Amino acid sequence: DGFAYSFQTCIGGLVVVPRYFEDWAELIETLCDKWRVTEKRKLIIYVHNLGYEFTYLIQLLTLRWGDCKALYTKSRKPLTLEFSNGIEFRDSLKLFQKSLARATEGCKHEKMKGDLDYTVYRTPDTPLDDKEFAYCVNDVLGLYEAIERMEKEHGFNAATLPLSNTALVKQEV
C-alpha cells in the first residue's frame, strides 16, 4: 500500500493542488457534470510518464470509476486509460518523447531545476513549503503550457492532438 501527498492538476491554466485523492476525484467529477462529459465527449487528463504513476493510480481509479479500456505501448506502459464516465488519461511523455524538463523548456513555467527531496516522508497532511508548492504548480502548469504550444504550432486542439509523437510525425509527412 502507498499514498500520494499531492494531486496537483492544471485546468485551462488554473492550478489546483488537492492533497487527497477523494478531493481530487470529486473535483474531476464536478467538472464532468458541469461540462457534460460522456464517453463521446471526453475529459482528457495528461499525466507525464503515466506508466510510472499507473500501478498506484489504477487501483484508486478503478475502485472509484470501474474498469477502464487501456491502450498499452508495452506491458505496464499505458498510452491511454479510458473510463466509461468519459474521463481519459493520456501519457504526455509519449506525446513529447522527452522529459518534462525538456518538454517545458521555453514555457513561462518550466519544470523547476532539481528534484524534491524524496527521502522526506510526506503525507497529504504534511504542509508543503513554498519551494515544494511551487514545484507542484510548475510541473502541471508547465505541462499545460507545453501542450498549448504544441497545439498552436501544429494547428491542433484537444480533440485532434495525436496520442503520440509518432502519430504527430506521421501526420506531418
Question: What annotation goes with each model-predicted range?
Answer:
Residues 1-10:
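Gly/Thr-rich phosphate-binding beta-strand-loop-beta motif of the actin/hexokinase/Hsp70
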Residues 5, 15-16, 158:
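Polar low-complexity intrinsically disordered regions enriched in Ser/Thr and small residues
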Residues 8, 59, 97, 171-172:
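Residue-identity detector for glutamine
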Residues 9-10, 111, 152:
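Generic detector of intrinsically disordered, low-complexity, polar/charged segments
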Residues 13-128, 134-138, 142:
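Conserved DEDDh/DEDDy metal-dependent 3′-5′ exonuclease domain
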Residues 121-173:
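Common nucleic-acid-contacting/processivity interface regions adjacent to the catalytic cores
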